[in-house]
Amino acid sequence: MADADREPRSGLCADGMTARELRADVPALSESAYFNFGAHGPSPKYVVDAASEYIADHEYGSGTTDPYTRAFETYEAVRERIAAFVGAEPDEVALTESTTDGINRVAGAFDWEPGDVVVRTDLEHPAGVLPWKRLEREGVEVRVVETEGGRIDREAYADAVADARLVCFSAITWTHGTRLPVTELVEIADDAGAFTLVDAVQSPGQVAMDVHDWGADAVAAAGHKWVLGPWGAGFLYVDRDAAAELAPRAVGYRSVKSPNAGEIEYKAGAKRFEVGSTTPAAHVGLTEALDAIEAVGIDAVSSRIESLTDRLKAGVPADRLLSPRRYETGLVAIDVDDPEATVERLAADDIVVRSLPHPDAVRVSVHAVSTAAEVDRLVEALEEEW
């Protein structure tokens, strides 16, 4: 085992903020060895403060400042910040509650007919399963592309999408932590004339993102995992041309050009997917979290995650490691005899991981704000499983 006190050099950033400094800003990380960022990334104090202060200012200042003007100015400011982070233009971004919310908004914008085909993989989170399962009631066929070890077979995928209307898959699998070839899968779907929707929730804050490079019609994500933002700060990218062909079923005064017009005329771009009077407080917090990640540097974050993840995998026997031995992301699936019992046992020692429904395993999420000492502690605690 490597020296627990030696930290990966990749945590350093030229602008002066380090991953260690970011960690010190997150109160929850002083309570345990936390390895569940793939589900929830605890926020720095200033992220929570920004969201709380926005609510206070919006509510307490409404006697002197129009609350709608304030909210709409904030919608646009946070939209611009999110767009810059993911490589989009502001009008291509809708503010949502979550990835699940974004996927549902897209699913509800099609005029589905019996016989239409939706394709997904067998590794999708329920966010990428349940909206399509509901459509089966309307006669929509849902095809599931089987994977092996977190990998997708290109030929099987191409066959499945040949006559599909929509394809939904994850950029990073939440089970194995594998990175799917997004651009290639999008191109195959495009050639078949299918709409492509990418679940990218495991990407922001862990890897650099450029949705234009991916070429997908839509990308749903959120900032409450690797970005360390608050719950409720979701976002949905929709290509301009793709958006023009979609008519969301959920519609309100924020969706349309003129709420009092005789006919519904949706706003251009992704704004048509926004509905009513939601607080942008969570997204205000998210912008603070994005600033923190960028202060460290996304390349430095990714490099440090790689160093710490490799350290973890070095302590896991080959027959127990379900994720690729070679690094892809900080999500690591480990085979244990009783995942739920293992999660509880580790929690009793103040080590936080989670169980997976499929494969039957525990999942460890290693972040740049994790430490080498924590990784070594986890490996030691897992040794009784082998």
Residue ranges and their predicted role:
Residues M1-W386:
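Pyridoxal 5′-phosphate
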